[in-house]
Amino acid sequence: MARAWVCLAGAAFFLSCLVLHSRFCGSLVSRTFSFHVSWRMEDPLFRLDLGWPKNSEYFTGATFCVAVDSLNGLVYVAQRGDNIPKVLVFSEDGYFLRAWNYTVDTPHGMFVSGTPFEQSVWITDVGSGPYGHTVKKYNSLGDLVQVLGTPGKKGTGLNPLQFDNPAELYVDDTGEMYIVDGDGGLNNRLVKLSQDFMILWLRGENGTGPAKFNIPHSVTLDAVGRVWVADRGNKRLQVFDKDTGEWLGAWDNCFTEEGPSAVRFTPDGKYLIVAQLNLSRLSVLLAPPSGSIGDCSVVSTIQLADQVLPHLLEVDRKTGAVYVAEIGAKQIQKYIPWHSRTPAFGA
C-alpha cells in the first residue's frame, strides 16, 4: 500500500510539472487539458516552446501584434512605447535579427504576404500623429512602400478610402485584402480590397444584428472561401462569403464571458485558434466543413496567467506554430503542435 501511495504521489507531481509553467511575473501559466471519464488525459494539441525567443530582452514595450513570414522563416513583432524600436524581426527559432522604427506611430495589427523573393509587411496604425489611421505596406527591411488611408486623419470616406483605428488585416494568396476597421473608432466595418486597392465590397456598421459590428478586431480566411471576423464587442465570430460578402452566420455560444480578440486557422484547416484578451485565454475551436457553419465547439483551451492579455496571434502556415502577442506580459509566446519534432523546452 505504501508503495502504491508513493507511485501515485510521483505521478501527480509529474503531471503538475507538465501542466504548469511559470513565465509571467512569477505567476503560473496553466494548460487546460481535456480528460476522459476514465481519467486518462487526451493528447493536447499544442505545447509551449520555452526556448523562444532566445533574446527576450528586445521586448521593451507592449507587444500588440505578431506576423509570420512562413516562406522565409521570419517572425515580425510590433510593439508600442516611446523611444523604442517599433518593429522587431526574429528568426523562427528565436534569434533576434534586426529592428526598424520608420513611419510607425501606434501599431495595432500586422500581416506578412509575398513570395520567397519579395515579402510585404503590412501594419495597421491607430496613432493620432502624422502616420496614424492608416494601413501601411513595408518591405522586409522596413522601407515604406504603400500607404492606404489618409495619414494622420481619421474618417469614414470611401473615395479616397479613410480609416479610423484599423484593427487588423488579412491578405490572401491572390493579393486581395480584408481589413477590419476599426478598434473603437468611427467605423465598424469589414472592407475587401482588390490587388490594386480598389474596394470590392464593404460590410458593416455599428450594431448588434447580422453583418453589424462592435469593434471588429481580427479577420482571417478559411480554405473554403469564408471570411471570419472577431466581432469583439458583440462577443461573437461573424462569417461572410469571400467573393460576395454575403453574411453566412455567427458563432456566439463559445463567447458568453468575453468576445474574441483574435482568430486564425491551423494550416490543415481543422481548427480555429482564438484569443480572449481580458480572460487571458486561448481556445481551440473545431472548424466547420464547407456549407453551414453550424455551432461553435471548443476542443481545448490554454489558460494563461492573469493580466497576460493575449491581444492578437498568428499561425505559421508551414510549421503550424502559434505566436501570441501578449500586451500585459509584454512578450511573444510560441506554441508548437504537440507532435512537432521541435523540442518543447528549447535548445
From Swiss-Prot:
The secretion signal range is 1-22
Keyword Flavoprotein attached = no
Ordered alphabetically, the record's keywords are: Glycoprotein, Repeat, Signal
Q: Where are the NHL repeats?
A: 47-93, 150-196, 200-243, 294-338
Domain of life, source organism? Eukaryota
**Repeat found in the keyword field:** yes
| Pfam family for this entry, one | NHL
Please list the residues annotated as glycosylated.
101, 206, 278
Checking InterPro entries in the record gives: 6-blade_b-propeller_TolB-like, NHL_repeat, TRIM-NHL_E3_ligases
Q: Which PANTHER family match?
A: E3 UBIQUITIN-PROTEIN LIGASE NHLRC1-RELATED, NHL REPEAT-CONTAINING PROTEIN 3
Identify this protein by name: NHL repeat-containing protein 3
